[in-house]
Amino acid sequence: MKFVDEATIEVIAGKGGNGVASFRREKFIPKGGPDGGDGGRGGSIYAVADRNINTLIDFRYARLHRAKNGENGRGSDQYGAAAPDITLRVPVGTVVHDADTGEVLFDLDRHDQKVTLAAGGAGGMGNIHFKSSTNRAPRQWTPGKEGEQRRLRMELKVLADVGLLGLPNAGKSTLISRISNARPKIADYPFTTLHPNLGVVRTSPSRSFVVADIPGLIEGASEGAGLGHLFLRHLARTRVLLHLVDISSPDPEADPIEQAVVDANAIVEELRRYDPELAAKPRWLVLNKLDMVPDAQDAQQRFCAEFGWTGPVFAISGLNGEGTQDLIWALQDYLDAEKRKDQDAQDQADGTYVFEDPRFDASRGGAAPATPPGGDE
């Protein structure tokens, strides 16, 4: 299925049905009074996040979504039927913008999350509501309200814990196929990857994380060159970025480290130009194609010194898997720690956080703390 991560649609909710002016007509009851019913509610349009969908392709070709109008009220105090609602199923991670103002309306980041894109109009009132002590036979009724109408731009940002960043042919697809269940197309020419790929990395039956691989960036990507800038938004939700750098060179006369430093600086600069917030995310350096370097340790030290890198660095070979296990476990431990921090912060905000007793010593096997001097015995 074709990957589509952006679509513009128009949603038109249904109009509410009109109320009606009607009077009770029954034998031997000459003055039956008003019995006009209310109009039915117009159909609303909802969006529901579905984890079984991974593309917005359905909305690329079906741009107009119009709900039906509610039925008009009837005599004998009969209300008009409400119109059926329309539910649009979208991928988890879809962000809905107002197409005219650019305002972010909804961010559907949980499975089964439901939001109202356009609310149906309320039904009008029948003349039964206007009866009073001074107006026993009212002829007033109200029309139904118009439903909401919007032009919306839907943008998909995939949900991943780790994002892969690098030039074309840096080995991103090879790495994700090595450490996860993803099977992207791999070839020895640039721009083999044409759309984001997601892979689940399992470190144990109960521990896993998701990796996102996007098309490679090239110099000038922030100004529209290449394909990578089209998909950088998919890295916005990640917790850490893996900056893959190819430290090998097909040219035996060229210095691969010097070229790798130039390439790495180009990626960092394009990231800063595109989105400073994305550039500020935690970033780990991954030196790839270790199997093609004579002295891997010397290459790593030289690169870090010339690149001015002091953060986490891993030297791997995506082809034979060397060094990938250390990378996987380091990522899992980091992500688990970040999730614990988020959970503690949420618990503190909710008032449910349990602070540790400073008198408790885990090394004593959970024994109760001694009674302080002067305490009750």
From Swiss-Prot:
Belongs to the TRAFAC class OBG-HflX-like GTPase superfamily. OBG GTPase family. HAMAP family: GTPase_Obg. One of its GO terms (molecular function) is GTP binding. Residues 127-148, 339-377 are annotated as: Disordered. Its EC number is 3.6.5.-. This is GTPase Obg. InterPro entries: G_OBG (IPR031167), GTP-bd (IPR006073), GTP-bd_Obg/CgtA (IPR014100), GTP1-OBG_CS (IPR006074), GTP1_OBG_dom (IPR006169), GTP1_OBG_dom_sf (IPR036726), OBG_GTPase (IPR045086), P-loop_NTPase (IPR027417). The keyword Hydrolase applies. Keywords: Cytoplasm, GTP-binding, Hydrolase, Magnesium, Metal-binding, Nucleotide-binding. GO terms for biological process: ribosome biogenesis. It is found in: Cytoplasm. Disulfide bonds: none annotated. An essential GTPase which binds GTP, GDP and possibly (p)ppGpp with moderate affinity, with high nucleotide exchange rates and a fairly low GTP hydrolysis rate. Plays a role in control of the cell cycle, stress response, ribosome biogenesis and in those bacteria that undergo differentiation, in morphogenesis control. It is an enzyme of class 3 (hydrolase). It comes from Bordetella pertussis (strain Tohama I / ATCC BAA-589 / NCTC 13251). Its cofactor is Mg(2+). Residues 160-336 form the OBG-type G domain. SUPFAM superfamilies: Obg GTP-binding protein N-terminal domain, P-loop containing nucleoside triphosphate hydrolases. PROSITE patterns: G_OBG, GTP1_OBG, OBG. GO terms for cellular component: cytoplasm.
